[in-house]
Amino acid sequence: MRRELLSKESSEIQGMFGRIAHRYDLLNRTLSLGQDVSWRRFVARRVAAIDHLRVLDVCTGTGDLALTVGGGVVGADFCLPMLERARLKARRLRQPLPLCAADALRLPFAEATFDVVTVAFGIRNFADLEVGLGELVRVLRPGGVLLVLEFSRPRGVLAPLLGWWVRHVPPRVGRWLSGDAEAYDYLPASVSTFPEGPAMCRGLESAGLTDVTVRPLTGGVASLYEGARPPEGER
């Protein structure tokens, strides 16, 4: 995989996702072997178990996770075509979903605004992971929870088969459906280079979170990371 394919600026990533917005849901279904729907439901159940009033879904994309979580969610994304897909989806479902055009590296919210912040399949696309994590923590209230759902490298006896699928099937399906070879090559490649497991947990702790955990899903095809912003006086 070419190094330059993975060394993208925010504007390049923004344009790439804009080009594939109309096929993005299908890409996630393909990349996840159809499991992304159940993963989002799992995250939504975790959100429901947390005492919360306001939830921010960063990199909301077409709104799948925000709409699964339900009321009290604000969806933020820097890709306008994605937000338009989310708006149409929410209207079709007759479900309110406030949307905000925002870069995850410069969120337009005051500190300690949200009880829960979620990110699904977006954090590996941050142009600067350290800065992005700092922003996610900044907008969390003390005691608030960050939930990050992200693709990871499979483990166990099925790892070779699952790894082959992630590397080869989505790019071929994506090129066939959209003709955008670069975008569909980038997305699986970004999974293989993104820090995961203990490395990602260390990044969350460095950003200021405590009680950081990781839970592999479906043989490690995806992972759910969780951490809390310390209450006032415990930092």
PLM regions: where:
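Core SAM-dependent methyltransferase catalytic element
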Residues: 210-235
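Hydrophobic beta-strand segment of the Class I
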Residues: 24, 117-118
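A short acidic, Gly/Pro-enriched loop at the edge of an enzyme's catalytic core
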Residues: 105-117
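A short glycine-rich, Lys/Arg-flanked "PGG" loop and its adjoining helix->strand segment in the class I
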Residues: 130-145
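C-terminal alpha-helical "lid/dimerization" subdomain adjacent to the S-adenosyl-L-methionine
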Residues: 11, 149, 153-203, 207, ...
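Conserved alpha-helix/loop element of class I SAM-dependent methyltransferases that forms part
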Residues: 23, 32-52
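N-terminal, positively charged/glycine-rich alpha-helical extensions of SAM-dependent methyltransferases
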Residues: 1-23, 166
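Class I SAM-dependent methyltransferase SAM/SAH-binding core
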Residues: 54-106
